Amino acid sequence: MYNFSVCLLNSPCQELSYEISGDNAALYIILVGRPGLGKTPPLEAAYRPIRKHDYALFKAYESELETWKAAGESGRKPVLRRTVVSDFTPESLLLTHNSNPRSVVILVDEIMGMFNPANRYTNGQLIEQLLTAWSGGALDVTRVGSTMPVHIEQPCINIVGTTQTKRVHELLTKGFEENGLLDRILFVLPKSREVPKWTDWDDGGEDRASMAAARWEQILGKVLALDYDTGEEERISHVLSMDREAKEYFFSW
């Protein structure tokens, strides 16, 4: 669900979110569990296709940059587009989002480390951005040395990360309960606290796992290939509507 949110924000399939609430479909998710429970591997596996997509964009950017330099740096300088960010400042986050208006995702393994500097070094600027983005409000940032601000009319910022069970309470001591951030976070805990045992792949399980990973990559690839906008001069989100039968099926589910 979270990966689809990352791929679909500000793209055709966000229609249901707008129809219900008028907001985007961003998700803030924290996986909670004791150390060694295996929180990170499934998260990385789920995001592998998106990271692969980002890497392809990076290689294309490298090629375009070399061509631009070879041409005497004439014309518009190429811009790197990416979806996943992990190490960032509030300003760089919005600059990344401006380059990729479809959506960005903050993917942090131990997410408590992200919240600590938010209050100490940026006076809560990051938190304010996240609260505004969640509500669908526009975001602006003025780059250092530039008088032209970056304006994001329809921000779509996702958050996903992990933390240890004993550290969840730290969010309550940082004022996030009062400003409403906690109400926007989905905390996910495992049904079982036992670590799965090693599996013998002699029964063909390895092939099934590879097929599942390939199928997952194919699904996300189709979603990422959807058009973002319909406007030529302005970035206008392209929205598809459900027909009556689809709506009835969804709400019955």
Model region roles, listed by residue range:
Residues 1-253:
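Phosphate-handling catalytic cores of nucleic-acid transaction enzymes
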